[in-house]
């Protein structure tokens, strides 16, 4: 079976996606560690962290909406 025309390996778009997710997740993980150090292992830590995630997602939604970008998962 000829492999001409097939690309092997990982595409540049996939690498870019994983690097972007890493850049987003590392600060969030550090935030959680700092909250856990400051508040201890309590529900306050989880509540503050969850609130930050909701605010970030809402900000992303409003930004994408202002640029005219639609979220595809809302149509399902």
From Swiss-Prot:
<dbReference type="GO" id="GO:0016020">
    <property type="term" value="C:membrane"/>
</dbReference>
<keyword id="KW-1133">Transmembrane helix</keyword>
<protein>
    <recommendedName>
        <fullName>Immune protein Tsi5</fullName>
    </recommendedName>
</protein>
<feature type="transmembrane region" description="Helical">
    <location>
        <begin position="19"/>
        <end position="39"/>
    </location>
</feature>
<comment type="function">
    <text>Immunity protein that plays a role in preventing early activation of toxin Tse5.</text>
</comment>
<keyword id="KW-0812">Transmembrane</keyword>
<keyword id="KW-0472">Membrane</keyword>
<feature type="transmembrane region" description="Helical">
    <location>
        <begin position="43"/>
        <end position="63"/>
    </location>
</feature>
């Amino acid at each position: 079976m000829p492999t001409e025309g097939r690309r092997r390996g990982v595409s540049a778009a996939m690498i870019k996606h994983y690097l972007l997710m890493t850049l987003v997740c590392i600060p969030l993980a550090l935030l959680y560690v700092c909250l856990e150090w400051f508040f201890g292992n309590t529900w306050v830590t989880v509540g503050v962290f969850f609130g930050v995630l909701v605010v970030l997602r809402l900000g992303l939604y409003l930004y994408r909406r202002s640029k005219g970008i639609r979220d595809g998962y809302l149509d399902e």
